[in-house]
UniProtKB/Swiss-Prot annotation:
Coiled coil: none annotated. It comes from the Bacteria. This is Pesticidal crystal protein Cry12Aa. It comes from Bacillus thuringiensis. The keyword ATP-binding does not apply. Belongs to the delta endotoxin family. GO terms for biological process: sporulation resulting in formation of a cellular spore; symbiont-mediated killing of host cell. The keyword ATP-binding does not apply.
Length: 1257
């Protein structure tokens, strides 16, 4: 028997027992990423196509990812160059997905044509069953045979044969690929053609990438490089021509034609155009490493109208004439409302979509459709409750309902988020009132998509809606990668105070995004984020028929002139009629953090900007001194009172060039020209003696291998004499061939300084207790100083000091209540899905964690200190070190989040390690907004009063990123005992504890009232109330359907009921929004118990699919009988009249003539069920069901005369709706009689949420 204490433990804020594994990883994006990582791991090792097919098969067969998205995933990793020594064929890999059977694998595997056939037929409204017959079979067989020969040769490392077959295959594909778009199937064959074109382009990539192994000469490689460009061009033109020909069929602007057109564009985008957009990236001449191109293209739903048929619009006035563009990320939906003078009808009058598109400044903007506009009559305006949207929890489906009383009234909108939660808005008339009927329209995003915005026509009240979708995989933040080439659509940027962003007059279908038509004098602003310091080449993909000019600026660096040539047709000609090309702007060192670049068009000649690409070089994590060049052309004044010419705690440089003049001791001005290369001494100082006269100093001609960098230029004079100067030009450079010098301490005073610091770590000479003011971070700083002592000069002393600092580190670990504060041990940490452990950072001796921007998943670390580790009436210190943090929130909670602070810690580099008693990190610096930044080291305190061992509040510690562009690198985290509380402090903490305890007990009372009745209902399902045992013999589907859980962990379908209870269980943890919390654990256990009961019910039922969870599978249908979903969400078999029926034949194993059986049916209307049995079906049992509502009826137990029974359901008079039907064995102890349950049930509409009965087992 499950008890309340068992399912609802007393412990405060507990996580579920499996919380480490219970991340929200069930969504498409998580599964897709998981699959990509598996692909990348195998591909890097030189895996064959069949190996990747095995990986994909798991996701395909479970239905987690559809075959088309699997192929897109494969294509995304084929640009990755495998490890040295392996030859992996990208062409044969993709072919193994198109035609898996030609390799003899997976005998039940469908080829991609079979998978896409239903979708293609729906798009083009043409039966393509005979498509394969229309393909030239002789040429097709020749193609497959050559593919097989090439693949076998590659697999066997027979490169001579592989080269021959590659050339043969290229020849066949060049001449015969048109067989896949035969006459009559020019559009229908397009998805197949695109798949084979993938293989052709990748085949040429194989020839270039594997040229040395395959034996191609340099001349042959040059030919292949030209040919791959021509092939991409030709295949792209063939696809776009056929696509546009198909699009021409939808020229009418009425609603019906628009819906067909929208569906055609949607399907072709997913099946064809997304592939075409990748083809240019297959050219290794420009894409030498793995490539990730983001898509911002949109697809739209059909126009849907939640109104009666006689009020639906069909005219062209509501059809949008503009192309739907990506707007940014949707963060809020609002609906304006109006009420008539009588106060009887209140409806939505418009939609406001609010978007987030300016990450660094956290700006939002909105797009309105008919928002708060007056269409007719006297209205009072208002606004419904807004629906806020978390950036990493987008909307994936919508449901709009209008309720009617002579006119549109009582509108409501319900949305489903990615994690299964819901949001809603409604327009409720002030007086309430009865409504005739509700009209509901629902729409869901295609797999892998999210809602970008909702469009409504401007002409009338909200009768006409279109959902515009974009890819879930398109992140809010433009995050650079040190491993991949990243391409970002230009439309992810914005134009500020220079008019609106304009697009070309025609849509561009082949880029995965809409290019920006940058007008003369307009500046595109593009913001991005880097998690690591690295060098990148920045380039643009553009189109310009006459060449053009412009300017480029990265952050606050100098303006750079751009002379952009005419784009040639080396790759593709877009639908806009211009050719796309690449233009390299330059190479730059980009430090970790947020950045902005600007591209200004400064010419009357046109320029279309498609995307901005970042090509990474090696990471500069090991040489963080490198930084962007700086140029200062403005005048810099210095004198005795202000001697600093330039300084930076963020950047340092190897080469400095100064021009100007100076005056000292009353002399006349003299010219000053100084050209310095970096010094070699560890303190980075270099002195230039300037005499009374013109100075031209040239120190060093080149960088030296062991040189260090400047980070400060100061003018001084040995005496107290006056001096002043003017710098008219200053240039600061880096030469990128220096290295970091590890200091070596060899002087006796340095040993003395370090020894003093080691001794100061301890509270006494016994050295068994740390000093109270010593942090874990400072211990590691002292360790680094000890390590820098010279072995040759101080070998003995160094060994003794190292023993002491090791002891200090052990004591630090013992006193730290956090487990793994340096992340040497992760067992106690809860981490966001994308948080990673890293090492080798100049500001940390130990490991640290990187909290990246929360692009797709929350970014956090969390740990709880149990109550048993604490002492009563004690103050505890919480401390840690943040190397770099932007929008990182520290939360420490016992009685209610006592510490909650968002910190901004700027990116800074380590200062040279010295023997002095200072850290290698810098002092607090100014942020971009000139406000004082937070220090790298934080320290706070929290007070603990009396211990609550039963409730176990403990101390909860967490760091998380709270803005989309935030990030952090942290380590040396501690919670340690400080001191006993004073009497006054004890009284203060007692008051806080009393308030906390009162709220805690109230919450438990409320939760208990909610879950106890459900607990009792579930206990009643099972024999001996054992949830792991068997359900009772009299349990029916009806019993399960009447059990209402307070909320749902996940929901897969739209449920237009929005009458939520006043109190909702907190499914997720209060801090970690992607992990199941204590209430979620309760619901999960309830759902598991119901799932087990449902499974047992299914196994008892002799009828297959008696609950119609898989439509009408296993049933033979006649007439108009069909599966349908009712307005309340109920799935039923509908027999509309007496001419429709459904039949199923069942066969009983281990048949017993004496075994009794019973029929139970839950239905509405008048119908009959007959069961025919015997050798010739001569025996008939009949049961009649006649009710005006959904009610369960059952017959008297009976026996069968044979093991085969035919069950026949028919309507007797009008509509007959069957919710479920069962035929079960009757226990020999059962004494049930024929009864009708007269309590109608509602299986979907409820005050809480319906039990999530599985729809597929």
């Amino acid at each position: 028997m499950a008890t309340l204490n068992e399912v609802y433990p007393v412990n405060y804020n507990v996580l579920s027992s499996d919380a480490f594994q219970q991340l929200d990883t069930t969504g498409f994006k998580s599964k897709y990423d998981e699959m990509i990582k598996a692909f990348e791991k195998k591909w890097k090792k030189g895996a064959k196509g069949k190996d990747l097919l095995d990986v994909a098969w798991t996701y395909i067969t479970t239905g987690e990812i559809d075959p088309l998205n699997v192929i897109k995933g494969v294509l995304s990793v084929l640009t990755l160059i495998p490890e040295v020594g392996t030859v992996a064929s990208a062409a044969s890999t993709i072919v193994s997905f198109i035609w898996p059977k030609i390799f003899g694998d997976k005998p039940n595997a469908k080829n991609i044509f079979e998978e896409l056939k239903p979708q293609i037929e729906a798009l083009i409204q043409q039966d393509i069953t005979n498509y394969q017959d229309a393909i030239n079979q002789k040429k097709f067989d020749s193609l497959q045979k050559t593919i097989n020969l090439y693949t076998v040769a590659i697999d066997n490392n027979d490169y001579v044969t592989a080269k021959t077959q590659l050339e043969n295959l290229n020849s066949i594909l060049t001449s015969d690929i048109s067989i896949f778009i035969p006459e009559g199937y020019e559009t229908g064959g397009l998805p197949y053609y695109a798949m084979v074109a993938n293989a052709h382009i990748l085949l040429l990539r194989d020839a270039i990438v594997n040229a040395e192994k395959l034996g191609f000469s340099d001349k042959e490689v040059d030919t292949h490089k030209k040919y791959i460009k021509m092939t991409i061009h030709n295949h792209t033109e063939a696809v776009i021509k056929a696509f546009l020909n198909g699009l021409d069929k939808f020229k009418s602007l009425d609603v019906n034609s628009y819906n067909k057109k929208a569906n055609y564009i949607k399907g072709m985008t997913e099946m064809v155009l997304d592939l075409v957009a990748l083809w240019p990236t297959f050219d290794p001449d420009h894409y030498q490493k793995e490539v990730e191109i983001e898509f911002t293209r949109t697809i739209s739903s059909p126009i849907y109208q939640p109104v009666p048929k006689n009020m639906q619009n069909t005219s062209s006035s509501i059809v949008p004439s503009d192309l739907f563009h990506y707007q940014g990320d949707l963060v809020k939906l609002e609906f304006s409302t109006r009420t008539d003078n009588d106060g009887l009808a209140k409806i939505f009058t418009g939609i406001r979509n609010t978007f987030y598109k300016s990450p660094n400044t956290h700006e939002t903007y909105h797009v309105d459709f008919s928002y708060n506009t007056q269409s007719s009559g006297n209205i009072s305006r208002g606004s419904s409750n807004p629906i806020p949207i978390d950036l990493n929890n987008p909307i994936i489906s919508t449901c709009i309902r209008n309720s009617f009383y002579k006119a549109i009234a009582g509108s409501s909108v319900l949305v489903n988020f990615k994690d299964g939660t819901q949001g809603y808005a409604f327009a409720q008339a002030p007086t309430g009132g009865a409504w005739d009927h509700s009209f509901i329209e629902s729409d869901g995003a295609p797999e892998g998509h999210k809602l970008n915005y909702i469009y409504t026509s401007p002409g009338d009240t909200l009768r006409d809606f279109i959902n515009v979708y974009t890819l879930i995989s398109t992140p809010t933040i433009n995050e650079l990668s040190t491993e991949k080439i990243k391409g970002f659509p230009a439309e992810k940027g914005y134009i500020k105070n220079q008019g609106i962003m304009k697009y070309y007059g025609k849509p561009e279908y082949i880029n995965g995004a809409q290019p920006v038509n940058l007008e003369n004098q307009q500046t595109l602003i593009f913001e991005f984020h880097a998690s690591k310091t690295a060098q990148y080449t920045i380039r643009i993909r553009y189109a310009s028929t006459q060449g053009t000019k412009g300017y480029f600026r990265l952050d606050n660096q100098e303006l750079q002139t751009l002379n952009i040539p005419t784009s040639h047709n080396g790759y593709v000609t877009g639908n806009i009629g211009e050719n796309y090309d690449l233009y390299t702007i330059g190479s730059y060192t980009i430090t970790e953090g947020n950045h902005t670049l600007q591209i200004q068009h400064n010419d009357k000649n046109g320029m279309v900007l498609d995307r901005i690409e970042f090509v990474p070089k090696d990471s500069l994590q090991d040489s963080p001194q490198d930084s962007p060049p700086e140029v200062h052309e403005s005048t810099i004044i210095f004198d005795k009172s202000s001697p600093t010419i330039w300084s930076s705690n963020k950047h340092s440089y190897s080469h400095i060039h100064l021009e100007g003049s100076y005056t000292s001791q009353g002399s006349y001005p003299h010219n000053l020209l100084i050209n310095l290369f970096h010094p070699t001494d560890p303190n980075r100082n270099h002195t230039i003696h300037v005499n009374n006269g013109d100075m031209n100093v040239d120190y060093g001609k080149d960088s030296v291998a062991d040189g260090l960098n400047f980070n400060k230029i100061t003018a001084t004079i040995p005496s107290d004499a006056w001096y002043s100067g003017t710098i008219t030009s200053m240039h600061l450079f880096n030469d990128n061939n220096f290295k970091t010098i590890t200091p070596k301490f060899e002087l006796s005073n340095e040993l003395e300084n370090i020894t003093t610091q080691v001794n100061a770590l301890f509270a006494s000479s016994a050295q068994d207790t740390l000093a109270s003011n010593v942090s874990d971070y400072w211990i590691e700083q002292v360790v680094m100083k000890v390590d820098a002592l010279s072995d040759e000069v101080f070998g003995k002393e160094k060994k003794a000091l190292r023993k002491l600092v090791n002891q200090a580190k052990r004591l630090s670990k013992i006193r730290n209540l956090l487990i793994g504060g340096n992340f040497d041990n992760l067992v106690a940490w809860y981490m966001g899905k994308d948080v990673v452990k890293e090492s080798d950072h100049e500001l940390f001796k130990s490991d640290h964690v990187l909290l990246p921007p929360p692009t797709f998943h929350p970014s956090y670390i969390f740990q709880k200190v149990e109550e048993s580790k604490l002492k009563p009436n004690t103050r505890y210190t919480i401390s840690g070190f943040i190397a770099h943090g932007e929008d990182v929130e520290l939360v420490v909670s016992r009685y209610g989040q006592e510490i909650q602070k968002v910190m901004q810690v700027p990116y800074e580099e380590a200062l040279p390690l010295t023997s002095e008693s200072n850290s290698s990190c810098c002092v607090p610096n100014l942020n971009i907004n000139e406000t004082l930044a937070d220090p790298h080291f934080f320290s706070y305190s929290i007070d603990v009063g009396s211990l609550e061992m039963e409730a176990n509040p403990g101390i909860e510690f967490g760091l998380r990123i709270v803005k989309p562009t935030g990030m952090a690198r942290v380590s040396n985290l501690e919670i340690r005992e400080d001191r006993p509380l004073t009497a006054k402090e004890i009284r203060q903490v007692q008051r806080a504890a009393r308030d906390w305890k009162q709220n805690y007990e109230q919450e438990r009372t409320e939760i208990t009232a909610i879950i106890q009745p459900v607990l009792n209902q579930i206990n009643a399902l099972y024999e001996n109330e054992d949830w792991n045992g068997s359900i009772r013999s009299n349990v029916s589907y009806h019993d399960l359907e009447q059990i209402m859980l307070p909320t749902l962990l996940k929901t897969e379908e739209i449920n237009c009921n929005y009458d939520h209870p006043a109190f909702l269980l907190k499914v997720y943890h209060w801090f970690m929004t992607d992990r199941i919390g204590e209430h979620g654990t309760i619901l999960a256990r309830f759902q598991e118990a119901l799932d087990r009961a449902y499974t047992q019910l299914e196994s008892r039922n002799l009828l297959h699919n008696g609950h119609f969870t898989t439509d009408t599978a296993n049933w033979t249908i006649e007439g108009d009988a069909h599966h349908t979903i009712l307005e309340d969400g109920r799935r039923v078999l509908r027999l509309p009249d007496w001419s429709s029926n459904a039949t199923q034949t069942i066969e009983i194993e281990d048949f017993d003539l004496d075994q009794e059986y019973q029929l139970l049916i839950h239905a509405k209307g008048k119908g009959s069920i007959t069961l025919q049995h015997g050798e010739e079906n001569e025996y008939v049992e009949t049961h009649t069901h006649h009710t005006n509502d959904f009610i369960t009826s059952q017959n008297i137990p009976f026996t069968f005369k044979g093991n085969q029974i035919e069950v026949h359901i028919t309507s007797e008079d009008g509509e007959f709706l069957i919710d479920h039907i069962t035929v079960i064995e009757v226990s020999k102890t059962d004494t049930n009689t024929n009864i009708i349950e007269n309590s109608p049930i509602n299986t979907s509409m409820n005050s809480n949420v319906r039990v999530d009965i599985p729809r597929s087992l």
